[in-house]
Structure formats: C-alpha cells, structure tokens
Amino acid sequence: PIGTDWSRLFEAGYVQEPEVRIRYLPWGDDVAQNEWAHAEGRDRHRVAAENPEKVAETRRLLDAHPDASALVFVDWLDQGEALAEALDVPFVSGEMPHHRRDRVFESFRAGDLDTVVVSRVGDEGIDLPNAEVAIVASGLGGSRRQGAQRAGRTMRPAGGSRVYVLATRGTSEEEFAQRQMRHLAEKGIRVIESNVDDGAGSGDDVE
C-alpha cells in the first residue's frame, strides 16, 4: 500500500526490496537540446522527457536484463509511441481499447511479452501486472504518489527487482527525480544516483 512504511515490510520479509537507480542522461543530439533551450513551460518539460538518449538508454537497460519482465513508463504519447516502435513492443495508453489492453497485459503476465510501454493510464487504477524491472522514462513532474506506485510495481514476494529513473541532465527533470526519490528513500528504498557519460554507454554497472 502507498501509505505503508515499506521498510517494515522489507524487514519482515514480506516483499523483496526494489533498488532504485536515477540515471542522469546527456542530450541525444543538438537538435533536441536546442529545441529545449528555446521552449517554454509545458513544451520544455516535453522536450526534456523526449530526449532521444532515453531510447538508447532504455535499450541498454533492457539488454542488461534479458530475462526480466519490464514495464517502461511514459507521460507523453509521442514518446511512448517512439519507444514502443524502437523496441518493437506494445504501447498501452488511454487511447487503446480496453479489450486490446487486457490482451496485452494477459500476454505479459503469461510471459509471452517481456516488455510493455505504459502511459500514465497505468497509474490510474488499472490492474497492471508486476514486473522485475521498471523504467521511468518520463513522468518526473508527477506526484510523489505516482512515483511510489511505479516503484511498487516491482515489489515481489521473492527475487530481485530494479527501478530505473531516466532524467535529462541540466533540466528540471533532475530536480523532479531527486524530489521523488527522497520520498522513496524515506520509505526505506535504497536509491543510487549515477551519471551516464556522453557516448560512453551506461556509465556504470547495471547488473
């Protein structure tokens, strides 16, 4: 439950503690960075969220966990569609008919699908399946409750689990990520921050 002191559940052995890693990314190209520099308000948040480097980093993280089930969370439809196309996986959004959404999640639970990209609809009362890996590719401006829900998707009775939070370096995403992760740390979840170097792959061990 969101209001629960998760550290007590971990100590009692009821759930496996997830590990949360915030990964600060460089811009994927100068075009996106220039667009962000000239954007304002909501558009600025969108451009930071849609940083092309997040596609490459998501691929690297999924490659590092080849046998794990993974949910990739986004707040922007264009970003979700681009990620789903790049990864060749389904994108579940509020625009998807309920019967199709149910089929996707049934396939995910059955192990026929390893990865699903999910829009904010996944945080709004939908019975999402649990996953071994969660990648938060955008949505860093959301509430602390939303951040807690997304981390909670990887809480399992046994086995390891990981949450990766992708934030574009030098933008408001850094502040949002740190704010949400402080909230998770207060609940007993271990949080690790790392910088992904320009052109240097994932920057640290993601195993």
Language-model features: locations:
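Conserved helicase ATPase core of P-loop NTP-dependent helicases/translocases
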Residues: L71-F73, D78-A82, D88-D123
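Long, largely alpha-helical accessory region at the distal end of helicase-like NTP-driven motors
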Residues: A64, S69-A70, V191-E207
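Conserved segment of the helicase C-terminal RecA-like domain
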Residues: R153-H183
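A short beta-strand element within the Helicase C-terminal
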Residues: T115-V117, E124-G139, S161-L166
